[in-house]
Amino acid sequence: MAESFSFDVVSDFDRQELVNTLDQVKREISQRYDLKDTDTLVDLDKENIFIITNSELTLNAVNDIIRQKAIKRNLSLKIFDYGDIEIVSGNKIKQTILLKQGIKQEIAKKISKNIRDQIKKINVSINGETLRVASKSKNDLQLAIKIVSELEESLNIPLKANNFR
């Protein structure tokens, strides 16, 4: 059995689902009685979501709506890294939500070490912001996927296994 099997460990999300989520959030803000006249702005750029609104109460309501809609669209809540609340012009406040994507080098090393400590006959290589896990045994790979899913909780980043070969 010279054939080798592998999969990639990545930390990413479906950007289109996030865009759809924020469209639903904007629609709900414009229709909800308590949020309709608050001049709340929700905006998305490449790496952040910006929320500008009148009060902290409104901000908390918008954050709750974002979480609810993200869950319904199968987005992990771990992709959101909530920043501090800033006071902008006059009576407006702003919060920046950083979107976590990619596995940082030190976290990749922790994941790699953890997998190798528990499974001896497995190769883990770090390729930029992804990890490639390879083995000759499919059972070892299934065990590695289980280890990765357990690590996801302790590291507080969304991890997915894909590109099974």
UniProtKB/Swiss-Prot annotation:
**What InterPro entries does the record tag this protein with?**
DUF520, UPF0234-like_C, UPF0234_N, YajQ-like_sf
Keyword Nucleotide-binding attributed: yes
Q: Write down the Pfam families for this protein, in alphabetical order.
A: DUF520
Q: Which UniProt keywords apply?
A: Nucleotide-binding
- At the top level, the lineage of the source is Bacteria
Q: Does the keyword Membrane apply?
A: no
**SUPFAM superfamilies, per this entry?**
YajQ-like
Please report any disulfide bonds recorded for this protein chain, giving both cysteine positions.
none
| GO terms for MF | nucleotide binding
Q: Name one GO cellular component term.
A: cytosol
Gene3D superfamilies on file? 3.30.70.860, YajQ-like, domain 2
Q: What does this protein do?
A: Nucleotide-binding protein.
Family (UniProt): Belongs to the YajQ family.
Q: What is this protein called?
A: Nucleotide-binding protein P9301_05061
Organism for this UniProt entry: Prochlorococcus marinus (strain MIT 9301)
